[in-house]
Design a protein with these regions (language model features):
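Alpha-helical cap/lid subdomain in secreted, periplasmic
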Residues: 11-12, 40, 68-196
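Acidic/histidine-rich helix-loop elements
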Residues: 28-33, 53-68, 93-102
Length: 196
């Protein structure tokens, strides 16, 4: 037995689409052992839903506007579609560069995304940035993205947008790995940078 052909047909235009927009923690990773939540996301949906992952490694909210990634999504978005957005890891670099921060530019850029999605009839959903895996001397998860997680939560509340606290969920996950055993926790991220 062998596969002799594969046919790929476009989904009907009416098929609901969930767009993903974010950084390396939700983009399609090209080589193992790197992985992201975004590339695992489609397995939770029936074939009647399209998952379109537009996340890109190294991206920020600002980049998704400047590099026209958001525009690309909006060009095909239809009423009833969703956009799930998760940034923060690379946005932190704007603090050192003195070009932004969580409660200033980050929140302003979130609002631009929300306004654009709503103008196209889509439904936005904000996710707080997943935490990096790191522990203090007492074995507690180090909170490296707390300001960005809080800024995302505040934005969702103020703009009346659905919100998933991925930061809190990922901290619980890392704590559970560490509780099983520090060695097990390290092996889960073997050869990794504690983010991917």
């Amino acid at each position: 037995p062998a596969i002799s052909a594969i046919a790929i047909t476009p989904a009907p235009r009416s098929t609901p689409t969930i767009f993903l927009l974010g950084d390396s923690t939700d983009c399609e990773q090209s080589k193992e052992p790197f992985s992201s939540w975004g590339q695992m996301f489609p397995r939770w949906f029936k074939p009647e839903v399209v998952i379109a992952n537009h996340a890109e490694s190294g991206e920020t909210y600002r980049d998704s506007i400047g590099r026209r990634r958001l525009d690309k999504i909006l060009s095909v978005m239809k009423p009833g579609d969703w956009l799930l957005m998760q940034f923060g890891h690379n946005d932190q670099k704007q603090i050192a560069a003195k070009t932004g921060g969580p409660f200033t530019t980050y929140q302003a850029e979130i609002k631009k995304h929300i306004d654009a999605v709503r103008a196209h009839g889509g439904t936005p959903l904000i996710l707080s940035p997943m935490e990096r895996r790191g522990f203090d001397a007492a074995g507690k998860v180090i909170s490296s993205l707390a300001d960005y997680a809080e800024a995302a939560r505040q934005s969702a509340q103020e703009l009346k947008v659905a919100f998933i606290d991925l930061n809190a969920f990922s901290k619980l996950f890392y704590a559970a790995l560490e509780a099983r055993s520090p060695e097990f926790s390290r092996q889960a991220f073997a050869g990794q940078d504690n983010t991917h």
